[in-house]
Each structure stands twice: as C-alpha cells, then as structure tokens.
C-alpha cells in the first residue's frame, strides 16, 4: 500500500513540513504533503530518525550536588555547618522526550513496512506515550524524595553540632561556684534564683522544624476559626403568622435588631407579639436575607386529603341566585314562582337574610337563593354569588339601575357566572325597557337583542307576565352548561344562614354542593362541629339525606357557625373536634394580632389628634348573617373623630349576661329581631343600661348615626354682622385711642368680635371694648350712623382702616 507524506506525518506525530525537511536533509528532494513515499524512501527516513545528536548535557547522567551551608547561632557562638557532598540523578526530560519520540516514529515506520494497519500503529503509539508519561512522573517523585532525604540529613547534622557546642560551654562539676542562699554585697537586698520547675537541668525544647511538623501546623491553621468576612444570607421559611423571637432565631440574629427594623417600618410590637406573614417577609428582606413562603400541612389539610370521593359525577339541579337593589321585587318574583307569600312576612317588606328554596318547573328542579338588596348586606350578596351557578339580576323598570344593582353586577363579574336580567315591574305605566338596556350596556351587560350574550326578560311579579319565559331561559342555560357534581361520598357544602331557635336549638341552613349528607353524619362548619340529628327541607319536610344542590336546615351543631363557612363531613367526632380546635386557635392568633394593631393605631391617633370619642355597642340578632352584616355596617360608620366599637355580638335573645357586660363596658344594647327576657330587663333598669329593639336594619343604622353625631364637636361658623370705616382718631385719658367710625353695612354691637383691616388685609383680630354715640354708651349702632369704637388691647388704628364686626356660631354636625 502506498503512503503519502500526510499519512506518515500522522504516524510520526510530526507536521508534513517537518517530514519533508527530514527527507530533504537525507537527500530526497521535491516532496510535498501529497507526495507518495516509496519503501526505499521510508528506509532513508527511518535511518535519518535513528541518528540522534550527541550533546554534553545528555552524556552526564549524574552530577555532584552543590555545597549547602546552614548557619546556626547558639548564644554568642556562630557555627557554620557544611553538608556532605551527595550525588543525585538529574533527569533530562526534554532530551529523553525527543529521543523517545524519534524511537516511536522509527518503530511506526518499521511496523508500516511489516504490513500492519495504520490505526493499530496509532493505538500502539498512544499506549506507549501514556506509559512514558507515567514513568516521567515516577522519576520526578523519586527526585523529590531524594531532595527531602538530603534536607533531613543536613538538619540532623546541624542539631548534633549545636548539641556539642552547648556541652562544651557548660562548666565542669569541680569548678562550679557555690550558690549561697542569702549571701549578697547588700544586706538589705535578696537575690532570687530562677530555676526550671520540676526539672532544673531540663533544656528548653527547640521548635520542631521538620517537614511533618510544618505540615501539621499548616493543617491546624487551616482548620482554625476564622472571622467571617462576608455576611451570611439565610433562607428563612415563614409559615403563616410568626413570633418576633422565632423570626429572629431563624435569621440567627438578635430579637432587638428585628424590633428596630419593625419600628422603622412603623410597626410597634414587643418580643412576644405575633406578626403576619407579609410583615415577616418584609423584615427578612430588609435585613438582607431571603424569605420563603412556606405552607405547613395542617390537621385540616390532612383530614381533607383523607376524604374519598367517587370520581363519577351525575347531573344536578342548577343553583340560581336572585340579586338586585332593595325594593326592586326580588322576593316578590320568587314568591310568584314558588306560589308563596314570603315577601308579606318580611318586616318592612325587605329581605334581611338569605333564603333558599327548590322549585319544580316543567319537570326540572331549580334551586333559588334570595339575597337582601340593602346596602348593609353586601357580604351576603357576595356569598350568594360565590355558591351560585346562574345569577338573576332583577332591575325595576321604574327605578332603573341603582347602586346595589351595580354592586351585584360587579360581584357576578368577579365570580364569573352567567347572568340573566329580569326587568321587573313592566306592568307599571311609563316604563322604558330600552333605556334600562342602554344603561346596563355601560357596565358590559349587553342584551342578546343588541348583539351581546346576556338574556334579558321583561317580567312582572304582580301579574306573572314573562315569568315562564324567565324559567325557560334558566332551564336553557342550565342545559347548555350541564351542571354536575359527585353524588356519592361525604357531603361538602356552604353555610347560608345560622340561628338560635327556641325549642330547636342551633339551626344551620346549608347548601349541599357535592356528596350526600345523611342523618348521623359528623359535620364540621367553621369553628363548630357535631352530629347531624335532623335534616329539614325548605318546605318543612324531615329528610333522611340531602343530595347536591339541595338547601336544607340541619340540627346538631355545637354552636352557631358564620354564614359562608365551609361544611365538611368527616369520619369521626374526634377528628372533627381536633379540626375545630385548630381553627379556633388560629382565629385567636388572628384576633390577637388585630387587637394589637388596633391598640397601636388608636394610640398613634390619640397622639396626633387627642382622644377619640367611642360608641360602645353590644349587638344581638336573630340570625348569624344579619349580625355579621350589622357589624360591618356599624364599623363603616366610624370616622376620625368618633367610632363605633362592637364589644360583643351574638345570636339569640338578650340575657342577663349581656346586660352585665354592657354595664361594665358602658355599651348600648341593640337587639335586631330579638327581645330581652324578664331578668335582663330588670337588670337593665337597675344598671341604667339602654336597650333598643329594631326589626329594620336601616332604622338601627340611622339611630346609631344620630348617637355618633351627638359626640361630634360642634362646627364653628362666623357671621359678619357689620362693617365700619375709620374716619378719625380721638385721644381719651380714660379710654385711650377712640376710632371715630361710620357704620357702612349692618350694625355694630357692644362686646362683639372685630377685625381691623388695612388695605383689605387683616392686621388685628380682637374684641370691641367700648361703643359710644356722642358721649353716651350704647349697645348697638345701625348702618349710616357715626359712632366711637374702642378696641381692646390695640392702639394702632388709623384713619382709612376698616373694622369688621362678626360673631361665632356653633352648629351641630351630622354624619
């Protein structure tokens, strides 16, 4: 096989130009990288590679080491130690590498002539090269060991020389002078003899300078404590609310430093106070660490994970919520659909709690939820929108779009449920349906007639006109959306309403959203738990179970839960108690944190504006939803000068304990659809506690507003009653300067407040001291009359000035 210069250069580990140069030096000219090399020319190339240049440095394998001297000082004697002459090998790595490379190239050519494959030759070369590198490393290590050995020998010889010198300097035993205990040239002084403890003849240990000792010292220095140069950044995991001390411990810092940061942020707390997760994250970032929001798996989470549901879902009735402004006919429309008279039973003709009913229309079951329209029941409407599938927005054709109508639209858009607009009261004269559609379109509620996606149905709750069309629209929407839920397994739902009822106890209205609620199930609702003793539907019929989309009344809970609380059925009462206790403990932490924040806020407000007037209120209502709505409405009445504080609230009648608490806290007792018992009434009379009863929510709110208005400081206003021009100044020994004036407008009264104006600028604000007409003192002077005015504590009145006479009037302020 013919080989080119290029091929041979790869085998020889040389460039093609180097191969061409070697051939030219051997007498083979005219070659380039692509030229073919014959067998004869390869032999010439092999012969050229075998000729190695002889250099003097390569002939001497060993040379004598140079002489090294170590100087050692012992007291005043300096000793110079000359080490032995040793021989050590000198490795000529570069020259040997060249020799080995030439030998490998020559071997490659020989193998090529023998007919071996070029790839095999390359592999053999790589193996031999690796072996050569290994041998070179071993040879270098041998040299280092030899150097180390020479160094140790030199150090030992130096130590021996020093030992001999020390021995020579010691005096002999016979010539050793006697040491007397107290002999001295001065009798008053005493010589002290310092000897080594335990062993007087012991020499001080010399510092070990061996290689091993130095290595150990280096390792000890490496592992010794070093003050950190850079600040350590911690990753701090924050799970919910956290104590200040615990947060400081996680950041490995002092709690006082954390308090300083919190004070800088305007948060006034102590070491044992609890701060919320957001505040803790800000503190961590402010102190240069990295905050991580961590979610701790609680007992509640574990319990919910253990609940097993059947994955098979079946069709369920749609849940429809009726929303809108107060007095727009929501309950009346639902009454017509149910063929009932609920609206007549509502006090004041307005709904004040959530009502839930099931209606059968054309063979289809529909669940209706009626919500209050009054402004105070905003949270109730939002709860209704959260649990619903379809919203019926009722708009009165005569009133049009009102504030609660707009609020209901926003609630629906936030939740993202379909909406059907029922334009009610079309039986009245002068109604304009198109105008209502136009106003609704400004809130992105566009009718299908106008190219939108919202069904709008004109109806009349009085005559029943359009009600069937409304029910058909509901059924059509439900059919399109195909509402379904898991019907087997533990029940899951929401508390719509809760109350205390005489003879029945705690009654909770819930809406089952999935699963099946059976009599005897263990149920958790908010902070309350218990065994389901009785299930009653909206018609008063006792049931054994409740399916999805059914609103039912349940008896058996330990207390009255809040409206909107989640309802879960669990396996045992013990687990239910654990979850309820866990929720109560978390709620206590939140309430404590709110109280701390409120105390600090009140303290700061008092520092800025003085004391704030407070109206203390103790509230009792018939149902939990009404109590929650009233608390929110009353707290919204608070201003910077006067605020409402609900010291206690509850569900049920007013008892003696409530009156005692009200007397202690100087609170006004408000009963909404409840009354005080005989004992409570007697205690209230004895303690002087004011008790008020209400059945309409806005009457209660208006009365509290009036009480708050009475605590407001009066508003001061100024009424200008006259203006007089100064014509001349008269001197009086008794009265001082008297301004002779002409009354231009109104009148001037004795003892009135005045202002002196010069060039329309107020230069003095004071009181009128004297008023005379000629030489007589008068009480008042009317317009167009001259008079003399004496100004109290002011003598700089000049002709041309104006005197403005005014009075301050206090006016009661109203919220």
From Swiss-Prot:
Region (G5): 460-462
Annotated region (G2), positions in chain: 349-353
Alphabetized Pfam families for the sequence: EF-G_D2 (PF22042), GTP_EFTU (PF00009), IF-2 (PF11987), IF2_N (PF04760)
Biased segments, Basic and acidic residues type: 153-176
Subcellular compartments: Cytoplasm
Binding annotation for GTP: 324-331, 370-374, 424-427
Comp. bias intervals (Basic residues): 191-209
Location of region: Disordered: 153-219
Stretches for region G4: 424-427
GO CC term, one of those recorded: cytosol
PROSITE patterns, per database record: G_TR_2, IF2
Known function: One of the essential components for the initiation of protein synthesis. Protects formylmethionyl-tRNA from spontaneous hydrolysis and promotes its binding to the 30S ribosomal subunits. Also involved in the hydrolysis of GTP during the formation of the 70S ribosomal complex.
NCBIfam families attached to this UniProt entry: IF-2, small_GTP
Family affiliation: Belongs to the TRAFAC class translation factor GTPase superfamily. Classic translation factor GTPase family. IF-2 subfamily.
Protein name: Translation initiation factor IF-2
The organism's taxonomic lineage, starting at the top: Bacteria, Pseudomonadati, Pseudomonadota, Gammaproteobacteria, Candidatus Pseudothioglobaceae
Gene name linked to the record: infB
